[in-house]
Amino acid sequence: MGIIHEENMPVPEPEDGRITFGSGYPSKAIEKFIGYYDRNSRIAYTPSMSILTDFSIARAYCMYNRSGKSDIVYLDSRFDPERSESAKIALDKFRSICGVKGYFTFYIERERRYVRAKGLSESSAVAAAVSSALVSNIFGYNVKAHSMLASRFAKFVSGSGTRSVFPGLSTWISYPGIQEPKCLAHEIKIGLSKVKIAMFPKFADYSTNQMHELSVKSAQYIPWVLNKFARFEEIIDRSFSLEDLLIRAEEEMLNLNSLLMSVGRVLQTEESLSLIERIISFRKKNPGLYFTADTGPSILVMTLNENLLKEFLETETDFYISGNIVKDSSPSASNAFRERGKAFFESLQRSQ
């Protein structure tokens, strides 16, 4: 189907003081990802697949400083030392691969349609935003391979971020033995307008990184991996049937939860389990409604029947967000964000 395309690495063109913009939306996995084969190179054991959603958005400015002393991350208008340290790890990888010296300052804002939740893939949106801004800064906005480079480097911030660079449906090609430059996502160009979605944000306090580490210790992990490769081939053979994708998203959620329960980790809460029970009860008389979740209790409801989704949501008292699958993954900066970003970099220059 021509999913995989390759582009050569362009020549870096760093410019001291240059400021560039990037943005990203959160991906919601159809074919889930958990566990790294090579954590240093961010190579997962399996390919994965997701849709891009509009439940939040991340916007980022990146400034290159040829003679700076350190990388700096400002997140939601405050200096974030923890994220600055984790950014250094990703940026060291970028500098090593591209042969670029110097440091970077990021000004990042997240805009959410909810207050607090776990499993809404905010990290993937941030990864796509900062990687897009970084690639634009060093290689230029119009470089032919921009999206593929942004996808490649986003994985060093968040594995799922490699897919958040692309609109609609995308797949992250990853498996043991793949070369790091080829371990990135590719857009799958199919019509998704019939897919209707809504999100029920739910909160839980646990670390996704811990889930990655624990998952590979499960006796179920190898069977889970083998099942994924087999089902991935089936989905491709059936030309990415929309019904198949929704069915697989639900199946994968249940498989992932089972996998992590086998190492003593329960992802769902009383609230999310109650919601799942109501979904299952509703569709006994109204088939065609599906649900899924990633490494968190937030539940995505999906269907190819818009009226069916409306009917279910009318019965619900839990907070939910009606959403859309994003068709354009590169929105421009809002005027308000431009003004705040400008003020930030001006104050930064005055303090130096």
Across the structure, where does each feature detected by a protein language model lie?
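Short loop segments at secondary-structure junctions
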Residues: 63-68, 175-176, 203-205, 304-306
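Predominant activation on well-ordered alpha-helical scaffold segments within soluble catalytic domains
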Residues: 27-31, 59, 88, 128-135, ...
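C-terminal nucleotide
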Residues: 2-39, 43, 187-352
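Gly/Ser-rich oxyanion-binding loop with an adjacent helix/lid
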Residues: 5, 100-190
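Short beta-strand scaffold segments in enzyme catalytic cores
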Residues: 28-32, 50-51, 58-63, 161-173, ...
